[in-house]
């Protein structure tokens, strides 16, 4: 009995490009190469993460061998602080020792002093470059100058404030504005202190219609040359006689209705009111809100409005639930696809190994 001849190299399953076996074997070879590469790279260190205060000297690499060293330098705007090391070594556990940018400190501006009758606050908690300093004054004083200074970088290792520190001065106000047909108290004072107040009043009128004071009657010095409110006006305000058809006045009746006169209404029996039952005479000679209406019949009940999602532009709750369910299905599909992909890759490698084993056994026979 003669031994079976060995399969020619050109007809080997892994050599026939048109066969499915060649496809499986090729994928297996790629998987082995990937495992080989990962096993060799597992003993290397990756490039360390970027640091805020220091940067790598020279050209960086993707991987470094165990025992290999890298050297750092402080970035622009940072100063080296001895005795911190600027060299790190790749350790067998894939870490760099030591690795810290504590040896590089940020360049600082000079520390600012509190002004008289004021304080300085460092908004960012420091006075290094990029920081801000805010100046405030005690009550009754105001800041003269820039209230906020910025620490800016000059060159590589210097920093300075972008302006001169301000100072605090007492708050004073010039006399308040004069008004037509009226006056204010303390007209003989030329300079008013902080929180000093004046009151306005209207002049008497020669006719039957009196002037009304429209606005705030008292204002005070609230800031440097700043009064707490605008001055009021003195003018004649008359609103028309309030008439409510199918209704009547129950409060505030009179012959003249001047500024801020208030009246109240009610409807006759068999009518209901649409609008506000109380109105006030405003500065523009009209009633606010508008005089109501008395409509015949019983007061209607408020109809129940449809849910907000029934209006155009609002999604319904069903659409929201469907969207959430759809997102969950997409996530589940991605997870299942990933698991199946890993399983297929493992199966490819296993089948390729089994095929090689069978081929070797056949060749040995």
UniProtKB/Swiss-Prot annotation:
Positions glycosylated per UniProt: 181, 205, 301, 304, 310, 312
Modified how: May be O-glycosylated.
Signal peptide positions on this chain: 1-44
UniProt entry tagged with the keyword Transport: no
Residues annotated as transmembrane: 330-350
UniProt function note: May be involved in the fusion of the spermatozoa with the oocyte during fertilization.
Annotated disulfide bonds: 109-151, 137-168, 173-221, 202-234, 239-281, 267-294
Null mutant phenotype: Mice have normal testis and fertile sperm.
Name the UniProt record assigns to this protein: Membrane cofactor protein
Tissue: Present only in testis (at protein level).
Pfam families: Sushi
Encoding gene (name): Cd46
Keyword presence, Coiled coil: no
Start and end residues of each Sushi domain: 45-106, 107-170, 171-236, 237-296
Lineage: Eukaryota, Metazoa, Chordata, Craniata, Vertebrata
Membrane topology (Cytoplasmic): 351-365
Any one GO biological process: single fertilization
Known partners and oligomeric status: Interacts with C3b. Interacts with C4b. Interacts with moesin/MSN.
GO cellular component, one term: extracellular region
Keywords: Cytoplasmic vesicle, Disulfide bond, Fertilization, Glycoprotein, Membrane, Repeat, Secreted, Signal, Sushi, Transmembrane, Transmembrane helix
Matching SMART domains: CCP (SM00032)
Topological domains annotated Extracellular: 45-329
């Amino acid at each position: 009995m003669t031994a079976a001849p060995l399969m020619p190299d050109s007809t080997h399953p892994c050599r026939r490009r048109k066969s499915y076996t060649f496809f499986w074997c090729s994928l297996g070879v790629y998987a082995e190469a990937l495992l080989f590469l990962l096993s060799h790279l597992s003993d290397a260190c990756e490039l360390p993460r970027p640091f805020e205060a220091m940067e790598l000297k020279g050209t960086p690499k993707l991987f470094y061998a165990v025992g290999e060293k890298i050297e750092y330098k402080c970035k622009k705007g940072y100063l080296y602080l001895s005795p911190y090391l600027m060299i790190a070594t790749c350790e067998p556990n894939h870490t760099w020792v030591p690795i810290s940018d504590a040896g590089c400190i940020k360049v600082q501006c000079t520390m600012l002093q509190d002004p008289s009758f004021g304080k300085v606050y460092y908004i960012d908690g420091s006075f290094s470059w990029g920081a801000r300093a805010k100046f405030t004054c005690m009550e009754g004083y105001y800041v003269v100058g820039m209230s906020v200074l910025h620490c800016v970088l000059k060159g590589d290792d210097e920093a300075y404030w972008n302006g001169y520190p301000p100072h605090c001065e007492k708050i004073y106000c010039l006399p308040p504005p004069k008004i037509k047909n009226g006056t204010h108290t303390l007209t003989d004072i030329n300079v008013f202190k902080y929180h000093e107040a004046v009151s306005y009043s209207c002049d008497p009128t020669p006719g039957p219609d009196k002037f009304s004071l429209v606005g705030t009657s008292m204002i005070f010095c609230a800031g440097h040359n700043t009064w707490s409110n605008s001055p009021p006006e003195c003018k004649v305000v008359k609103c028309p006689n309030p008439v409510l058809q199918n209704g009547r006045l129950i409060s505030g009746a009179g012959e003249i209705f001047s500024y801020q006169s208030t009246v109240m209404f009610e409807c006759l029996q068999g009518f209901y009111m649409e609008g506000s039952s109380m109105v006030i005479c405003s500065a523009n000679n009209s009633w606010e809100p508008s005089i109501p209406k008395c409509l015949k019949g019983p007061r209607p009940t408020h109809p129940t409005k449809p849910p907000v999602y029934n209006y155009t532009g609002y999604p319904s709750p069903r659409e929201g639930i469907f969207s959430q369910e759809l997102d969950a299905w997409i996530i589940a599909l991605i997870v299942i696809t990933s698991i199946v992909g890993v399983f297929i890759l493992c199966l490819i490698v296993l089948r390729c190994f089994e095929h090689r084993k069978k081929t070797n056994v056949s060749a040995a026979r």
